[in-house]
Amino acid sequence: MRALLLAFQLLSVVAALTTVNCRLDLSPRQISRKDLLRTHLRLYQVGNFSGQPYSAKATLRDPEGRFRFEDLPVSHDENSTVYFQLVASSQDYNLKPNRVLIEVQGRGEGKEPTVRAFQNVFGREHFPSPEILYPEQLVELEAEPELVISYVHAAPMRNYIVSRRSGILDSGPLAGIFRSKYKMAAVVTIIALLLFPMLVEKFDPATVEAIKEQRLSQTREKYAAVGESNS
C-alpha cells in the first residue's frame, strides 16, 4: 500500500510534456526552400534540472515559417519552473531575437503550464532566470499563441575563400586604370587613334589612296612655292 502511495506521489510531480509554438516571419518576402535549409533552430534546457537535460532541433514546417518544439519536460507542481534557451540563426539573415529565454511554469494538476518568453542577449544564455540584472532585465515577448522571430536585415556576404595574393587587375597600375573611368576613356581613345589608319586601309583602300594623293600634291605645291621664291 505504501508503495502504491509513493508511486502516486511520484506521478503527481513527474515531468509532463508540453509544446512551444514559434514562427519565423520574413515578410514581405515569402519563405523559400532555401530558407528552410539555411535556417537553424535549437532549444536546450538551462538552470537546475535532474537527469538528462532537454535538447532538440526544429525545422520550418510550412511556407508560413511555423516551427515548434515538442515534449518539453515540465512539472505539475505549482512552484516548479523550468527554463529553456532558444537559439535561432540563419545563413542569410540577422534574426531578431536570436536568443530567447523560455520559462515554463506549472499551474497544478489538470492545468496547462504557463509559457513565457524573454528576449535574451549574447553572454546570458545560461542564466536560468529573467530577473537576474546582468547587466539589465530581459524584455518579455509575446509567447501566445506563438513566438514570432523576425529579421533585422540581410546578413553580410560571407567570404569562405579569401585570395592572399591579388592579381594585376586588383592592384597596381593596371588596376588603377580599370578603376578610373577617365583613365579608361583616355586609353580607349589612344588605341582608337592608333588603329584607325589600319582599319581604314583595310576596309576602304580607295579612300586611303585619295588621302595619299592629296598629301603628295600638297608636298609638291610646297616645294614648288619654295623654288619660285629662291629664283
Curated annotation (Swiss-Prot):
Residues 1-16 form the signal peptide. It is a single-pass type I membrane protein. GO terms for cellular component: endoplasmic reticulum membrane. The chain crosses the membrane at residues 184-200. Keywords: Endoplasmic reticulum, Glycoprotein, Membrane, Protein transport, Signal, Transmembrane, Transmembrane helix, Transport. GO terms for biological process: protein transport. Residues 201-231 are cytoplasmic. Its main location: endoplasmic reticulum. Glycans are attached at N48, N79. InterPro entries: Sop4 (IPR031395). Residues 17-183 are lumenal. It is found in: Endoplasmic reticulum membrane. Belongs to the SOP4 family. Involved in the export of PMA1, possibly through the monitoring or assisting of PMA1 folding and acquisition of competence to enter vesicles. This is Protein SOP4. It comes from Eremothecium gossypii (strain ATCC 10895 / CBS 109.51 / FGSC 9923 / NRRL Y-1056) (Yeast). The lineage of its organism: Eukaryota, Fungi, Dikarya, Ascomycota, Saccharomycotina. The gene is SOP4.
